[in-house]
Every structure is written in structure tokens, then in C-alpha cells.
Amino acid sequence: GPCSLESQENCKEVLDALYPIMKGKDWYFKGSFDKANRTSIHSDRGPGIHKGLDIFAWIKATYPSVKLVTDIHEPWQAEKLSGYIDMIQIPAFLCRQTDLVIACAKWFKHINVKKGQWLSPQAMEHVVTKIKEVNPKAKVYITERGTSFGYSGLMPDFRAVDIMKSFSDGVFLDCTHSTQKPKGETTGGDRELAKKYALAAKIFEYDGVFIETHPDPTNAISDADSQVELEWIVSQINNI
């Protein structure tokens, strides 16, 4: 799905394209209600939690069987989101925040943790342990979203897949955020490289992929350089 929910109309355009072709596949529609870590204080952060919940409710009512995933930023949000979201996602920058991790473990059965860009794959076992100690029945997944490569680059470490599989319930590759180039007033990216990561993920035996897609990426309110065109996803879904 899109980086930000942006609007109900934008979500409808994405879902109208994906819903028919994703039947029979294990997939989640992703959209963020709040882009809480924007580079600039003036950047659009999205609809916010209250309007976001309305959009999530509309999706559930309009597209039966669609599962939802969104990111959380503060512990109090867990309870509010639990009635709408099938899998909660902990952002990479927040993956060591114990109160947030515990809140997710208390309210969700499926938790996707983005690996911090500065952390070794082995260090993620501590995050998984926190969740499992609070909720032993929770399914905990780890998403590789790139490791810091110099001051303004990220590079996925394909060696980490088997390491993180050994203590989690699955490992995903974030194809789009792994191409980000944190710099200046905006965060850059490389959607063409993201497409190559998506096609290569199965070679490294990831359990799944995380891909942000948008009908008009260059005009998206966030991650305009890394989101993949919706038509590309439609054309390549059976190759991913």
C-alpha cells in the first residue's frame, strides 16, 4: 500500500487495483496514519489517528478479507488501533522503546518490527524476547529496512536473513525504505533499485516483502522517490 494513507480516495485507487489480483495470497494493505518522523516540521504528516481509523474502518467494510498493517508511534495508540489493525508495525527508530514494544505485545497477536538501521541482526533477538515474554503466543516478524551505509545511505544485509529467522516467526525485506538516502531537507530513494530488491527477495529466502506503492509516486506526500508505481506492482506481482 501507500506510505501515507493520504486520503480515502487514494486508498481506494490502490485497493481497486490490488484487491482482485491478490485474492488467494497472504498479504496486508499498509498505510500510515501519521508520518511522525518527517525531516521537516513543515512536511505533511498524513490524516492523523482519528481520520485514519475512519479510513481503516471503511477499508474493512468495503474490501472484505483485506488485512491491515500500520505503524505505531506511542504506547497509548495500541489499544485504539487494536480494533482495526491485524498486524501492528513498530518503526525502526522505535524498535528499542520498551514501553511501546510492551503495549504492542499486550494488544496484538501479530507484530512486525522494523530492524533499526544501526542494529546488528543478532541484537534484534532482544526485541523479540521482550514481546514473547509479555505475550508468548504473539507472532513476531522482523523487517530488514537497510543498515546504515555511511552518513546518508542504507544497504540491506542479505546475510542477516537466516540469523533473524532463527529467533523470529519470519523475516521480510523492505524493498522501498532500504533504498532511502537520508539527507538535507528530504529523504531520497531509488524506486528502480526497490524493484530489483523485490524481484531478488526470494533468492535470499525472505518470508515476504514490504513494498510501498502509489498511483502517482512523484506526487506522494512522503517517500516520493522510493515508492513503486502501482502499475508495476500489478504487472510483476506473480514474479515477487
PLM region descriptions:
Residues F108-T213:
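Catalytic alpha/beta core domains of metabolic enzymes, predominantly
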Residues P2-N10, W27-I49, T213-A224:
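Glycine-rich, proline-tolerant flexible connector loops at the mouths of alpha/beta enzymes
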Residues Y28-K30, V69, Q89, N112, ...:
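Conserved beta-strand positions in the central sheet of alpha/beta enzyme cores
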Residues A17-K23, D44-V69, A103-H110, V161-F172, ...:
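Alpha-helix-loop-beta-strand connector modules within alpha/beta enzyme cores
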Residues S4, A92-L94, Y197, A201-D223:
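Glycine-rich phosphate-binding active-site loops on the catalytic face of alpha/beta enzymes
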Residues G83-Y84, F204:
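Structural motif
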Residues S4-A17, P47-D54, G188-K196:
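Glycine-rich anion/phosphate-binding loops
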Residues P47-G48, Y63-Q77, D86-L100, K109-P121, ...:
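Catalytic beta/alpha-barrel core
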